[in-house]
From Swiss-Prot:
Residues 67-74 are annotated as: D. Forms a ternary complex with IGFR1 and ITGAV:ITGB3. Forms a ternary complex with IGFR1 and ITGA6:ITGB4. Its main location: secreted. This is Insulin-like growth factor 1.
């Protein structure tokens, strides 16, 4: 998969690809709000629109990964539980 060019990914294949690309960070099916200037003009598109109905590459998949959380924040959350 990693060496493949743009292809369509749907359902479980799409989820597997996102898990592969994003790892422990997790991912979103819709881009976070305020993403890019085009989001104001066009209706919000999700990963299914971009990668299942059309083809997408690894760089496009990475746009849906959740941001990395700082290690300190992760530790303090665990300490509170």
């Amino acid at each position: 998969f990693a060496s493949a060019g743009p292809e369509t990914l749907c359902g479980a294949e799409l989820v597997d690809a996102l898990q592969f690309v994003c790892g422990d960070r997790g991912f979103y099916f819709n881009k976070p709000t305020g993403y890019g200037s085009s989001s104001r003009r066009a209706p919000q598109t999700g990963i299914v629109d971009e990668c299942c109905f059309r083809s997408c590459d690894l760089r496009r998949l990475e746009m849906y990964c959740a941001p990395l959380k700082p290690a300190k924040a992760a530790r303090s959350v665990r300490a509170q539980r």
